[in-house]
Amino acid sequence: HISMKAYNEETDTMLCESVLSKEEYFRKKKTMGADIASANYQQEPIDLKGRLYQKFSTYETRSNYIKIWNYTDTADTGADNLCSIVFGETEDHKAEVLDVLFTKEPMEKTETAHAEQIKNNQVNHVRIESNSGGRGFSRNSERIVKERGYRGAYYEPFHQSANKQSRILSNSALVENNVYFPSDWKIRWPEFYEAMTTYQREGKNKHDDAPDAVTGIVETLANDNQVRFIQY
């Protein structure tokens, strides 16, 4: 069985540009959704039953927040994405996602983008996984934020020692019921949306940056409040 993909991720080229251009492919992918495009053009059907997250909670209008947080998972390798999520903690200790930075850009660019994200969202508490280059990233982002006149953020780089895969799996129900995304999050952050909605419970996942950071949200709120989340 030969699998011929319309788009080659490694070379960033199309199988046959005259039949389907790269621009047209990405337009179709955005319109029909990554899962359908993947099945139609990449011969990679997504296993719907095998998805880790079977549902996502959404919100239309922002609540009142008792605190604005940021959770950042820096890229471990060149193939990884930096995933930085700003979320508001509601009075009943739910999380509403306000802003997402999800990129493969090099650290020298993302440090500035991260600092802007912290400043623009008036974040109170920044938690950054300090594994690999996270500690230096945290230091530089904090310096840039202060240079730009915002001093309201407390930076907390910390070492994440728990197993990533088991953290993601064991917290999936908490994520489904306690993390709320904007109703238009598919349009706002298409790559992040794709990473969350196609992540498989078992089998090979190329990347886990998005689920890792979202798992960090529920861990952060649980540790900060010592509250028991409702698991359905």
Predicted segments, located by residue:
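Extended C-terminal subregions enriched in glycine
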Residues: 124-138
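Signature of the SF2 helicase/ATPase Hel1-core->accessory helical subdomain module
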Residues: 1-10
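Gly/Thr-rich phosphate-binding beta-strand-loop-beta motif of the actin/hexokinase/Hsp70
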Residues: 62-89, 213
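C-terminal nuclease/phosphodiesterase catalytic domains that cleave nucleic-acid phosphodiester bonds
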Residues: 35, 39-44, 78, 85, ...
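ATPase catalytic-site recognition across NTP-hydrolyzing enzymes
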Residues: 10-72
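Flexible loop/turn segments at secondary-structure boundaries
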Residues: 10-11, 48-49, 77-79, 93-94, ...
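Nucleic-acid-processing active sites and adjacent nucleic-acid-binding tracks
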Residues: 86-128
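Short, glycine/acidic-enriched loop or turn micro-motifs at the edges of active sites
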Residues: 74-77, 102, 132
